[in-house]
Amino acid sequence: MLLTTIAATSCDNANDWTVDAAHNRLFSCDLSGVTPEDIGTEATLEFKTVKGAEYYLIEVSKDTLYNDIEMGSTATSIIYGEDKSIKESPYTMTGLDSSTKYYLRLKAMSGNTPESKWSYLSDYSFKTKSEQIFEEISTADLTENSVVLHWLANAEVTKLEILKGEEVKVTKDLTNDNEAVTNGTITIDGLEAQTNYTAKIYKDNVVRGTIGFTTFAAVPSADLVYRMTADENLSNELLAEITAQCEGTSITIAMPAGTTNKYGEALELVDGYSYTFFGIAGEKKPVIAISTITLKNNALIKFQNVELNADGINAEGTAKTNEYIINQSAAAVVDNITFEDCDIIGFKNSIVRIQSSSSIEFKKVVFNGCYIKGQNLASKYYVLHNNSGKFGEVEYNNTTFDCTGYRGLFYSENKDCTSINITDCTIYNIPASGQYVIDFKSTNNGATNGIIINNTIFAKVQDASAAKGIRSNSVQTFDNVWTTNDFKLTGNQFSGTVTAFDGTSTDLFENPAAGDFTIKSYNFGGRLNAGAIKWRMTE
C-alpha cells in the first residue's frame, strides 16, 4: 500500500518525497504547456518543478524526440539549461525559427540524485508564431514600379521574394549582399503599376517576415492629361480652361501630392465630358475640399488616389464643413461614378445623393480600395442616398467603412436599383439607431439582380437596441460574411448565410475606435480572407 501511495502522489509538489524509492531518481515533471510568443522566435514553457531538482534541461528539435534518442543528437536540436540556469518555471526559449513545429522534452537534474526521466508535452510538439521583421512600408517607399523594403538590421536572412498572387516574380539572394543585410533595406525595381504584391524574407526555408504592398497607379491616359501645378486651385474657372483645351471627350486632371484644393462654390462639370481627378503619388494624397460637385450628362467621373475632405470653405472663404460630395438636383445621366483608392473624410451627409428629381440616373457607382469615415454626429442620410431618381449598379469593393454618423450604406426611396455588390469590405458602426444597413423603404422594391455580399465583416452597430438589416425584396446571396457579437440586428435580419465571430469588434480589431481595423485575433476564421485586404493577416 505504501508503494501504491507513493506512486499516486509522487508528482505532487506538496509531498515531502524527493526521490523515487523504486528507481532512486528525481521524479519527472508535469509539463503544463507552451505559449508561442508574438515575436515568433520565442516560446514560453510552463512546468511543475520537483523537489530535489537543482536545475532543468530542455531540449527542442524540429525532428521527433523520444526516449531512445540521445540528447542533442538530432541535427536540429537546441538544448537550454546546460549552464544550470533553469531553476524555475516558466522559462522562455529564444533563438527559435518562426512558424516552425518543434518537439520538446524536459528533465530534472541534480548533482546528488540521478536525473529524472524525460517529460514530454501531451501532444509532443508546439509551433512558433509567424515572425515579422519587416517594417511598415510608407508612401515614400513606393513608386509606380518600385518599392523600398526595410527590415531589422543585421537580422539572419538569406533570401527575399516578391510574389504577385501565388507567383514568385522576383527572388533576391541575400547571402552575399552584406550591404542589404547590414542596413536591413533593399530596393526592388521593375514592378507593375497599381499591382498588389507580397514580400517574404527568409532565413534558409523559414519565413521571418511577410508584408503586402501596392505599387502606385500611373497617371490614367485620356484625350487630355492636364497636370496642375502646386499653386493652382481647383475651381470652375480652371475647369473651364482645361476643358477648352480638350479636342476629345476625356480629361485627366493630375493633382500634385500634398496640395489642398478648397473651393466654396459648386464645381460644375461640362456636359459631354469624362473627368478623372487623379492624385499623383507622394507622401500625402492631394486634398479636394469643395462645396459640392454638379454633374451633367457625363460618361465618367472618377476620383483616384485623392482625399475628399469635408473641411472646406463657403463662397466668402469662411471655414465650413461640407455636407456632400455630390448632391444632384439637376437632370443628368451619368454612366459611371468611381472612387478608387480615396480617403473620404468627415462629410455631414451623403457621399452621393440624388435629390427629388426622376430625371437623374447614375448607372454605376463604384467604391474601390477606399477608406470612408463619417462625422461624429447623427446624419440624415446614407452613404448613397436616392430620393427620387435611379441608381443602377452599386459596387463596394475592398473598402473600409468607419461609419459613425452615417445611417447606413444605401437608401433608395421606393425605387429599384440594378444590383448591389459588396466584396472584401470592413464595415464598422452601422446602421444608426432605427435604421438599416440597406433600405429601399419597403419590401416592394430592391436590387433587381440581387444583393451579393462576399468576404466581408460587419462589426458593431450604433445602437444595439434598434439596428436593422436589409429592407427590400431582393435575393440576398452571401459568401464568407462575418459578424462580431456587437453587431446585433433587431429586425430585417440578413437572409444570406452569416458566420458569427465569438467576440466584439475590439476583440477582433487592433483599435477600431481609432480607425485601426487590423485583424488581431487568431481565433477569427476569416483572418486571411475577410474584410478589406489591408487589414487581413497574411498567414
Where are these regions (language model features)?
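C-terminal motif of bacterial Sec signal peptides marking the signal peptidase cleavage site
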Residues: 6-10
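Acidic Gly/Asp/Thr-rich repetitive segments characteristic of extracellular carbohydrate-active
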Residues: 219-262, 522-531
